[in-house]
């Protein structure tokens, strides 16, 4: 057999890489590596909307935990620290990862650290949470958050003019009442850790604003731990809904979309007329306990961070 020259092999390799780029295939050159570290903190925080102190279990002292954002094909090196000052075991479960549960998602004791690596293979918006027992209590007390995996090809869906991240969860006034958690006897349902956090009629509420005809993209995660969310934009219709935030899972012209506990979706809406458009879960027992976020459409909408998720700090 005739051997190929090193020059020909190099040219062939370059052509393969070039074709991969043209086809939008991930390559080691384009993919990035992210070192993500979180600390499990058992802290007393002040509940937004009530002013009451709450004994929370958190990632990095905030509820929800920090938002993680990567691109499809990226590698995530994750480390969780459980400080000696804590009392309970904690763990991490990333719904965006495809790795061994027993090895990587095991609970660690106070004073221990665990690390694992995964590749974000699928685009979307995903839930992450502590899985230590009793998991229902760890989630209810604040150990949850969101990871967004952007598609490697941004042209697979329309470009958003504004992006917001909303994480829905249930809140119990007594975080030690596990029986009430199993009985679904929650006191509030909240967005991003606050009761009526984005309701314009409450003093101190934060604003979700956009200009007419801007495409607003909402990354939505339902942390639960128990209740389904039936997300609806009052006065509007979702232009597009993407199950699990994956551009391949596209629905058009949706009035209300159900997101179960531990699941997520991405919602696009383009509003032509100025006004206020409340975003609610149409499970009214949940909406009327705090899960209402008003989207204000105004020509003078202020510029906002990409994801205006204000930490719920101790």
Locations of regions flagged by a protein language model:
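N-terminal secretory signal peptides that target proteins for export/translocation
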Residues: 1-7
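Extracytoplasmic/periplasmic copper-protein system
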Residues: 33, 42, 140-175, 180, ...
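Short, surface-exposed ligand- or partner-binding patches at beta-edge/loop junctions that are enriched
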Residues: 91-92, 124-134, 272-286
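Bacterial N-terminal signal peptides
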Residues: 10-24
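N-terminal, post-signal-peptide metal-ligating segments of extracellular/periplasmic oxidoreductases
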Residues: 20-105, 110-115, 149, 181-220, ...
